[in-house]
Amino acid sequence: EISHEEKKPVILCKYASSMLHLNSSKYFLTEFSGDWAHEANVTERELAFGKKVIDTKLGARANMFVSPFFQLALDNSSQENAGEVLVGTIGWTGNFRFTFEVDNKNELRIISGINPYDSEYSLPAKEVFRTPDFYFTYSTQGKGEASRSFHDWARNHQVKNGNDTRMTLLNNWESTYFDFDENKLIGLMDEATKLGVDMFLLDDGWFANKYPRSSDHQGLGDWEETAGKLPNGVGRLVEEAQKKGIKFGIWIEPEMVNPKSELYEKHKDWVIHLPNRDEYYFRNQMVLDLSNPK
């Protein structure tokens, strides 16, 4: 925690959550990288003198190309059931940075926290700024034990009802993509019931009328049922799910908008953008400024 008693706000520029100091003969770092549908590719390398940084500056998409956790084996490369292994992560969904520095004595320091890039924070007097928690576990029985320890901790202390039985669900996306109507969805619910599934989840494609959501190029932001697909609304689907004894879920992405939408036409100023810069689209969409009181 950081606080002060100056008369004016203090600008915080660099504030890590933790620093671990290790002394071992060798250090083997495992990191995970990838992309959509190609996630968590494993790379292990021995650390030598100097710095190795794992970080991201993508903000809300912080875990898209690099995962916010690491694995460190001591003395030897990592094994499943033997050897010393430390696994760490940070309780933070934005820009992060892990710095691994081996010095001239072959000692290792691991500094973890919010990425200082574009992260200046104005802290008023007598208020407290709390850095995100750094979570780690240590194993003498390899990465398998470390992984299980993290799973146990998450179930017992982090995840709501973490030890309850997990629900099974049927999501219509891979079955229909954007091409569905009320009857097709009810038919999928019937099949879900036969399988003993606990929940039916209605995915992307159920909304917008002026620009119906028939692809990812339009409709995002217009949160009303598409009359051509769901003439009786989402309520009819909920009723059908209740009759069949299954739960009903629905997909929504309220923070995003397509340029081809009624919302964008009426409130273009609600979109986050940089002055004098062209709009940038990812999956044909942009981010809404949820801090805008309008």
Question: At which residue positions do the language-model features occur?
Answer:
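Short coil/turn motifs at secondary-structure junctions
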Residues: H4-K7, Y138-S139, E255-V257
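Terminal connector regions
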Residues: F136-M167, E174
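Polysaccharide-binding surfaces and accessory modules of carbohydrate-active proteins
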Residues: E1-E101, E107, Y117
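Short acidic, Pro/Gly- and aromatic-enriched capping/linker segments at domain boundaries
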Residues: N104-P124
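A residue-level signal for beta-strand positions that form part of recognition/binding surfaces
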Residues: V85, V128, M167
